[in-house]
Amino acid sequence: MAVPISTVAETKELRGLNLIAAHSHIRGLGVDADSLQPRTSSQGLVGQEKARKAAAVILQMVKEGKIAGRAVLIAGPPSTGKTAIAMGMAQSLGSDVPFTMLAASEIFSMEMSKTEALTQAFRKSIGVRIKEESEIIEGEVVEIQVDRSVTGGNKQGKLTIKTTDMETIYDMGTKMIDSMTKERVMAGDVISIDKSSGKITKLGRSYARSRDYDAMGADTKFVQCPEGELQVRKEIVHTVSLHEIDVINSRTQGFLALFSGDTGEIRSEVRDQINTKVAEWKEEGKAEIIPGVLFIDEVHMLDIECFSYINRALEAELAPIVIMASNRGQARIRGTTYTSPHGLPLDFLDRVVIVSTQPYSGDEIRQILAIRAQEEEIDLSPDALALLTKIGQESNLRYASNIITTSHLLSQKRKAKEVSIDDVQRSYRLFYDPARSVKFVNAYEQRFIGDQGAVNFSAPANGDAMEIS
């Protein structure tokens, strides 16, 4: 007799696309809306009051449209929150103001020239708010009558639609009947019809028809029957970037390239025509230019040609605010033999407003690590948090933040509810920080492969000769 096979189902909760990144705990700059005074700890940011206030002032001018074509450099040692401040600015700007973030190394590509990549980044950071008025028919469908020809000719029909104040009958042609069938419009639906394009939008079911069926799908939405006139004029606002307009006009079916990302190089003639057209729309009051923000991280990785291009691009009529971050002191400018502060050419530094970030204090490191643990849904014991703070001070903040997760995994293995000091100590012994790694390399330098590929296998690990008796 066969033994029955038993199966045990195991389910794991996955986060999907909502993963925890290094700066996912940041919600804004954490400043007062009226006075722009930074709070000690707010919206995920801790400390760096001067840098945050400077960023808030820049942000305020961006929102008011009073500043464009300026360059700001956030300079400071590693692990002092330069990228975090930029992320806070992006969160505070909202979805309407374009914010483009890229690393300097992304500029260098075999498929695209450096100037084209920078041009596209600049154009992505400039928004165009286009206003258009359209006539819309909005109401509740009372009845749909469709007359189909016996010989297979054109279909004709009538649409009875109403608001709380009036009711009207419209004649429908073949295309409108097909659109109604496609959207599955029936009596009792509240719909919106754009007269210029013929687009039908199903807003939901009327509350008056809520008892028509005993069971309905989860996606069924009930709305009130519209009031007033059936035909109303609405102003619709679209916000697009100049780069999106460039891509759409650069080729036939260019809008498909927006989804595939294969934009390629766009000719300067196309951009000039778009600039002229946008300027016309602006004069006619149809469009409004929104200067956004372009953030370039690790800006010292750009070469002298890129800096020369940015110098010229900042003087153009359509230019965003360029915010850069660098952790270099005196460094060589890429593409030259010259050394300059922050790795930027001196003529470019003249045009830059510099915001400095300072190393975090012990208390600020403790608050940041506590926020990170809360974001990752990890409970830390007070002793574990104190040890992590000490590690953050003696090593760096990134390393201390990284071993929070590994300590949590070790605590889960022993079925603990919170991370203890023993878990942090075990993680510290398992994973090296940069200082201990350098010490290890120096101790075993002869056993590592050198620049020329040479390695000394006979060198003892502890420096003493091996004895075999």
Curated annotation (Swiss-Prot):
As for subcellular location, the record says: Nucleus
Q: Which reaction does it catalyse?
A: ATP + H2O = ADP + phosphate + H(+)
Q: Which keywords fit this entry according to its UniProt record?
A: Activator, ATP-binding, Chromatin regulator, DNA damage, DNA repair, Helicase, Hydrolase, Nucleotide-binding, Nucleus, rRNA processing, Transcription, Transcription regulation
Q: Does the keyword Ligase apply?
A: no
Which Gene Ontology CC terms are recorded? Answer: Ino80 complex; NuA4 histone acetyltransferase complex; R2TP complex; Swr1 complex
Residues the record lists as binding ATP: G76, P77, P78, S79, T80, G81, K82, T83
Record GO terms (molecular function): 3'-5' DNA helicase activity; 5'-3' DNA helicase activity; ATP binding; ATP hydrolysis activity; DNA helicase activity
- EC numbers: 3.6.4.12
What's a GO biological-process term for it? chromatin remodeling
The primary location reported for this protein is nucleus
Per its UniProt entry, which superkingdom is the organism in? Eukaryota
Subunit structure, as described in the record: May form heterododecamers with RVB1. Component of the SWR1 chromatin remodeling complex, the INO80 chromatin remodeling complex, and of the R2TP complex.
Q: Kindly give the PANTHER family that the UniProt entry links to this protein.
A: RUVB-RELATED REPTIN AND PONTIN
Q: Which family does it belong to?
A: Belongs to the RuvB family.
Q: What does this protein do?
A: DNA helicase which participates in several chromatin remodeling complexes, including the SWR1 and the INO80 complexes. The SWR1 complex mediates the ATP-dependent exchange of histone H2A for the H2A variant HZT1 leading to transcriptional regulation of selected genes by chromatin remodeling. The INO80 complex remodels chromatin by shifting nucleosomes and is involved in DNA repair. Also involved in pre-rRNA processing.
Q: What name has this protein been given in UniProt?
A: RuvB-like helicase 2
Which species?
Aspergillus fumigatus (strain ATCC MYA-4609 / CBS 101355 / FGSC A1100 / Af293)
Query: Which gene name does the record give?
Result: rvb2
